[in-house]
């Protein structure tokens, strides 16, 4: 089989001669088109790799007016959730022949706006955005520029923009129902306000489970704390704030905690282990994301599992539809969740 010399570029015509297929079939196979049988695609792609074929992205872009590149603007990368989402988005994009440009806003509106401008300057076809509470201005800017985009993991309202999220209300309901099933009836919801919409959806699920179990309002507690992942957040103040709140809840007889996400639940478990007055507290903990189900995580958490791969597939497909002219009203895709039980929530002693 003829190899690429490093001087003479391998063309689709070369691959067609080598495989016996038409240039059109080779073209479709190399672009992973579904109209070509999988076995044929795989054979052509294997031959192309062996011959050293490299597609001409610039020429393709000039012909189509598109770059087949998407920008992904992530939040704060200290949270392992974003690494998992980045992996699954990469897989979904590759299956649809898109390249990705990853950026990080650190959950800051000013950086988010800078990232959007940088993505637009690089002529991306569309943007997957993990928004902040202040993203409405970014959304207005994207709409004004005519750049297709989808909000990932977080919504800002049902009619604001396309979004793909997990079922946050149902997830919170499952989490709190599990606490109640284990005999815990004095319950607390510990959250941040990174996204008000997410906080409120999970609060709805928290209250639905409590209502069904007949738990009175005086036995339901909520606390919104500092965000420890923000660069401008005073870590010591956050630690002290959480410690004081947990000490207070113990005095009030709280025996079950629903925590907004795994990252925060791990911080809570650290406080419980490091604070002598809290070390023997019989409190169940359930959180959200199930990071432990995907990668190593330093906590044995009972957690609501999001279908990361399905969220990524839905987001890429929705964005692709918009790129190709889909003009439907904003679509809000909600992916199912399930509860994964571990040692952080056991029957009450």
PLM feature spans:
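N-terminal helix-turn-helix DNA-binding module of bacterial transcription factors
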Residues: 1-66, 346-349
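Short, solvent-exposed amphipathic alpha-helices that sit
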Residues: 43, 80-95, 171-174, 197-220, ...
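Alpha-helical recognition/docking segments in bacterial nutrient-uptake
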Residues: 1-11, 65-177, 181, 195, ...
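Flexible loop/turn connectors
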Residues: 239, 243-349
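Hydrophobic alpha-helical segments within soluble ligand-binding/sensing domains
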Residues: 164-189, 201-208, 235-247, 265, ...
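Short beta-strand elements in bilobed, periplasmic/extracellular small-molecule ligand-binding domains
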Residues: 93-105, 207-238
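An alpha-beta-alpha
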Residues: 175-215, 331-346
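Short beta-strand segments enriched in small/hydrophobic residues
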Residues: 18, 23-28, 62-78, 178, ...
């Amino acid at each position: 089989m003829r190899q690429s010399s490093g001087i003479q570029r391998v063309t689709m015509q070369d691959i067609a001669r080598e495989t016996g297929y038409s240039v059109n079939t080779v073209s479709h196979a190399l672009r992973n088109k579904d109209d070509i049988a999988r076995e044929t695609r795989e054979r052509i792609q294997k031959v192309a790799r062996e011959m050293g074929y490299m597609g001409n992205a610039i020429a393709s872009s000039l012909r189509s007016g598109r770059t087949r590149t998407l920008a992904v603007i992530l939040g704060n990368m200290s949270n392992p959730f974003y690494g998992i989402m980045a992996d699954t988005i990469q897989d979904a994009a590759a299956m649809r022949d898109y390249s990705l440009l990853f950026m990080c806003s650190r959950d800051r509106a000013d950086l988010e706006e800078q990232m959007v401008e940088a993505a637009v300057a690089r002529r991306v076809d569309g943007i997957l955005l993990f928004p902040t509470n202040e993203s409405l201005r970014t959304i207005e800017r994207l709409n004004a520029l005519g750049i297709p985009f989808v909000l990932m993991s977080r919504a800002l309202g049902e009619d604001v923009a396309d979004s793909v999220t997990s079922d946050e209300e149902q997830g919170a309901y499952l989490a709190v129902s599990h606490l109640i099933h284990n005999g815990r009836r004095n319950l607390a919801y510990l959250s941040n306000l990174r996204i008000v919409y997410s906080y409120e959806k999970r609060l709805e699920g928290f209250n639905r489970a409590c209502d069904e179990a007949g738990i009175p309002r005086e036995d339901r507690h909520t606390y919104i704390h500092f965000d420890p992942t923000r660069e401008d957040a005073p870590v010591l103040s956050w630690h002290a704030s959480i410690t004081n709140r947990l000490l207070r809840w113990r005095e009030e007889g709280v025996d079950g905690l629903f925590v907004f996400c795994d990252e925060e639940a791990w911080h809570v478990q650290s406080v419980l282990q490091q604070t002598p007055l809290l070390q023997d507290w019989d409190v169940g903990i359930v959180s959200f994301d199930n990071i432990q189900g995907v990668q190593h995580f330093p906590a044995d958490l009972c957690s609501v599992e999001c279908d990361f791969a399905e969220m990524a597939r839905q987001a890429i497909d929705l964005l692709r539809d918009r790129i190709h002219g889909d003009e439907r009203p904003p679509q809000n895709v909600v992916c199912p969740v399930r509860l994964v039980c571990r040692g952080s929530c056991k029957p009450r002693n």
